Amino acid sequence: MDFASGLPIFIVTLREALEASLVVGIVLACLARAQQMQLKGWVYRGISAGVVASVLVGCLLAGVLQGVERLPGPYTPILKALLAALLGAIAVGMLSWMLLWMTKQARSLRGEIQGQINQAVEKEGGGKAIAIVVFIAVVREGFEMVLFLAAQQNMANPAAIGAALAGIGTAVVMAFLIFRLGVKLNLKLFFQVMGTLLLIIVGGLVIGVLKNLDLAVSMMGLANLGLGYLCFVPGDSCLLGPLLWNLAPWLPDNQFPGIVLKTLAGYRDHLYLFQAIAYGIFLSVIGSLYFRGLAGKGDAPQAVAQKS
C-alpha cells in the first residue's frame, strides 16, 4: 500500500476520530464548568472501554478474513469474494447512515451532551453515566473505522494501520488545540469538506461491492454448482452489464495518478454499466440528502474551548 491508497483510510479515520474527540472535549468542558473534574476519570474509562471494544471487533474481523484465506478447497475464493461484498455493503450502509445522522444532529449535539452530563453530575453515581456517554461516542466511531478497514480488506496491512493511526493522531491533536489551547478552527468548513470526501469515497465502495459480488457469481458459474444461470449478462461480466470503458492502457487504476482517482473518487480503469448506474444513484440520493441537510442545519458542531 502506498501513500495514495492510504489516503481514504486517513480521511475516514480523521473524520470519525475527530467526531469522537469533540464529544470527549465537550464532556470535559461540561465537567470543568460544573466544577466536577473529579469525575474525569470516568471519561477516560469510557474512552478506554470504547477503544478496547473497537480493537476487539477489529481483531475478530481480521481473524475471520484470515480464516477464510486459509480455508482449503476450491470454494474458498467464492467465499472470500462474498464476504468482501458483504462487509463492503455493511460499510456503505453504516457510513452513509452516520454521515446523514451526524449532519442532522450537528446543530443540537453539544446541547444534548451538556444535558446528559448535567443530569449525570446531579445524581449519585453519575460517573457511570458519563462513561457510557463517552463509550458510545468512541465505540460508534471506532466500529465505523473498523468496518471501513475490513471493507478495504486491509485489516492486517501495516501501512493501512499506519494510515489509520495517523488519522486518529491528527484528530487527537486537533481536539487538543481546540479544547486545551483555545485555537479557533472552522469546524463547520472542516466537516463539510470531509463529509463530501467521505461521500465520494463511500461511492467508490459501492463500485467495489458490485465487483466482488460479480466475481463471486462468476466463480459460482464456473464451479459446476448449477448456478450458471446467474450470469444473465453476456460478456466478461455476470451482473455488471456491458463494459463502458477500458482505460487501462492510458490511465491504469493501480498506478499514479489513476490510483489517486480510484482511492478518492471510485475511479476504475474498467467500468461496467451497472456499476456506473449504482454509483450515480448513490451519489444522487445520498448526496442530495447530505447537502440538503447542510443547507438546513445552520451551524456545524461547535466545540467550546475550555481549559481543564
Curated annotation (Swiss-Prot):
UniProt main location, coarse: membrane
UniProt cross-references to InterPro entries, sorted A to Z: EfeU/FTR1-like, FTR1/Fip1/EfeU
Subcellular location field: Cell membrane
Gene Ontology, cellular component aspect: high-affinity iron permease complex; plasma membrane
Keywords: Cell membrane, Membrane, Transmembrane, Transmembrane helix
Transmembrane segments: 46-66, 82-102, 159-179, 190-210, 271-291
GO MF terms, alphabetically ordered: ferrous iron transmembrane transporter activity
Membrane topology: Multi-pass membrane protein
NCBIfam families according to UniProt: EfeU/Ftr1 family ferrous iron transporter subunit
Family in the record: Belongs to the oxidase-dependent Fe transporter (OFeT) (TC 9.A.10.1) family.
Protein name in UniProt: Uncharacterized protein slr0964
Organism: Synechocystis sp. (strain ATCC 27184 / PCC 6803 / Kazusa)
